[in-house]
Amino acid sequence: MSNIYTSADQLIGKTPLLELTHIEKELQLKARILAKLESFNPAGSVKDRIAKKMIDDAEAAGQLKPGSVIIEPTSGNTGIGLASVAAARGYRIIIVMPETMSVERRQLMKAYGAELVLTEGAKGMKGAIAKADELAKEIPNSFVPGQFVNPSNPKAHIETTGPEIYEDTDGKVDYFVAGVGTGGTVTGVGQYLKRKVPSVKVVAVEPASSPVLSQGVAGAHKIQGIGAGFVPDVLDTKVYDEIIPVSNEDAFADGRLVGRKEGVLVGISSGAALHAAVELAKRPENEGKTIVVLFPDTGDRYLSTPLFAD
């Protein structure tokens, strides 16, 4: 039977779960760590899911029509995902991002035909959001998906990522671990899994040098994609049972470990999530348990960063 797709956005989702057997052995872990490899999405990250869902829902609501311009503030992967879906649907797209994001991310967005507007690095995501709102007022027929406030973001994970994890593990999942950027992933997957497996524990990962969720303090950090510096509207702060802060150095080290031990290149935030998952796996009470950790993207968009500097 033929199995042919007619648009790249039909390829989003159904990403594989990989047990990190070599890392389990190397670190003598007695729990299983299963990594959800979101780099298998067509534009290379978990953000493809929310890009498609936000555009689908905006089209259904009449907010996006032929000739509309999509404007989005993003630290990178959402911009790449939106640029890909916009290209597949024929929309013009403008991405607003802090100048501190990796050069690969900028090049990728441009490769999909997106226009880029860079904002002052020191102002972080707040500066990018303010600039996007300003552009939206100036440009007619524009639409700002607003990943930090758009309920379609967590909904994408309630409808796709959560069910995929549940089905692929036959419901045998004890922990779900994910970094918090917009909070959409941890919220959507967490809500879905807790409905299906009430005993599951959800663990949020944030940068140790910007512990907004655990201590209410924002700061500079190098873990691109998580730690926005504020508590996003779409984040359900009641869904997670624990917050694990991870240092830049540990995120880099564990990100490198995946490539060298498992043969899969992952990004910095995947390294942070793995560090938290390993911390859980080392606890004696978690022997024999299954920990699902979400790896948001691939490492090839971080070749210019300290992740692969040595």
What role is predicted for each listed range?
Residues M1-D310:
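PLP-dependent amino-acid enzyme catalytic core
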